[in-house]
């Protein structure tokens, strides 16, 4: 399945609650739609998600229309533009 992160609003502030109530499976695609001049998508670990810090070597997506295939287990994504993750621009997704 393909999921548009944030729905019609796209990847933006206060998307932290977007995954609630959805069932994700390994191999599902998350589609992140955003303005690449204003946001990005960074794959982080749980610590990076909690603290909004980007771990060294983290994968960064910047196209504005990123398709990311979910691995099994927990995945964490943030925007690391200053202050954005702190404003709820982050999601944690568990794929079965």
Curated annotation (Swiss-Prot):
PROSITE patterns: COPPER_BLUE (PS00196), PHYTOCYANIN (PS51485). Residues 1-96 form the Phytocyanin domain. Cu cation binds at residues 39, 79, 84, 89. Disulfide bonds join 52-85. CDD domains: Plantacyanin. GO terms for molecular function: electron transfer activity; metal ion binding. The keyword Metal-binding applies. Gene3D superfamilies: Cupredoxins - blue copper proteins. Keywords: Copper, Disulfide bond, Electron transport, Metal-binding, Transport. This type 1 copper protein appears to be the same protein in cucumber seedlings, peelings, and several other plant sources. This is Basic blue protein. It comes from Cucumis sativus (Cucumber). The lineage of its organism: Eukaryota, Viridiplantae, Streptophyta, Embryophyta, Tracheophyta.
